[in-house]
Amino acid sequence: GKSIPDRAVEELDRIGKRHLQENYLQSVRLIIGPGEPTKNLKQSAQISKVSIIKAMTLQKLVELKAKYPGAINLLELKQYLEPGQIDDKINEYIAKIEKEIKLRSHIIQLVKRHLEKTGAKDAQVGNLCIAYLYDHPPQNLKDKELYDILIELSSPLTGYLGRTKEDDWKKDRFYYLRDLPIN
């Protein structure tokens, strides 16, 4: 396949400085292209602090964003944009996000199953913490960590769970609203 021309970094520098002027050095510089970058391109990217990513890796990131609109935190993603080839770093970030989504989906299903089994309309945090321990959790969570995720899932922005707030966080009650599909 084709590779990115060696002079791509120099062209990006020249055009970027012309259009962005004093903002150029603070801006994120990214080259998207096919194949492996040449040795010279990698060296230029390191010197000019330009990240290089394959189109397929970018596509995975875009598909994740399309499927789970709120899942990608741009400030967090920016930490993965290092000078040079960054496909491994971006794939690491995608895997981290997918793991977080699976955990949240598991917790939503836990609430749903708990309410089905108990016949209750909602469940107290303490009961959900115990249920989580016995539900083959994908990762260990402290009670407060589980509570924080329950809060996130009950936010009006996500709307997967509902919440009845009490005077103590351990007494807050949660109920199921909708699934978070994963595949």
Each PLM stretch: what is its role?
Residues 160-183:
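C-terminal engagement modules used by replication, chromatin/transcription, nuclear envelope/ESCRT
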Residues 14-15, 19, 37, 121, ...:
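Aromatic-enriched hydrophobic runs in primary sequence
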Residues 52-166:
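Non-catalytic C-terminal interaction segments of nucleic acid-processing enzymes
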